């Protein structure tokens, strides 16, 4: 099963695999009784109050809700129905959470537009303010009813979101799909109504490119109005319209060749895009080099590495491998860490954790 991939060592997964027929039948009964006017509503899906977890990611504090295994099953069943509905009409360059459309896909697409060199004189960078936390459930359900007419299916989705009056919960498998569904009208508005062809969205983060800067400013004003009227959402105040980076010429200053740079690079998804190369955001690069030095000091003291440091370093290696930053890796990362050794350590730790980990229980469900 997709939702139990790489979790076969967990005892609850082993139990479910051993009693798969009974579990599937119990799930069927639960779904059949999760409908308006069900014959046995006491057998339906009843989510309990979930305890949030807090993580820090890219300098932001995020609230995560972890569903238990049967709740994950229900989410995957919902996505099996939602996925063909959403992907059939989704904008081809809306990335993030779509299969095969991750950050690397988005990066490759944007780089191809830049290399083509047409219609990229200026760019606009916009982001929706607290998108997941600001989505109103009643507005989400209203948008779903536009294309989905099955009251039973809509009721199951609504029950999954009980306890969240405002905001789509991070950590739910259905959340990323619901978010993409909700933003699809915005994609249509920008590409068809406003007529921008060079635009890409990574979740709620978007880049629009055009030769006319005034046209970009007008578009942002209309996007603000569209988001407010239809979804009651706002753009972050950090939106920007800038001339895209290019080298206007070269000159010799004190015997050294210096380039005359006009405009800015596009800071998007943690990458820095220019016409000549793709780099990494300065904060990410500094964090990676500082962590490498810290791990080297731990090694000199004959201390073990922290698991979170190993995971972070392997993540940073991924950034260096897909950008034009090998020189930074060669001088500031490679001398201090052995990537192969780190991979072996984390693999061993993950196997050990899977043997002992227990997933949280939080859903009341009566077996058949």
Kindly give the residue locations of the regions a language model identified.
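Reverse-transcriptase-like RNA-dependent polymerase core
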Residues: 27-60, 73, 149-163
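Short Gly/Ser/Thr- and Asp/Glu-enriched loop/turn motifs at secondary-structure junctions
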Residues: 48-50, 200-204, 238-240
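Conserved polymerase palm-domain catalytic core
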Residues: 111-203, 207-228, 235, 265, ...
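Beta-rich nucleic-acid/ligand-interaction surfaces
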Residues: 97-105, 199, 207-209, 240-254
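Conserved pre-motif C helix in the palm subdomain of viral-like polymerases
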Residues: 61-90, 165-193
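Right-hand nucleic-acid polymerase module
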Residues: 67, 72, 76, 163, ...
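Non-catalytic, polymerase-adjacent accessory regions of viral genome-replication enzymes
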Residues: 1-25, 29, 358-368
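Active-site-proximal segment of RNA-dependent polymerases
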Residues: 75, 79-136
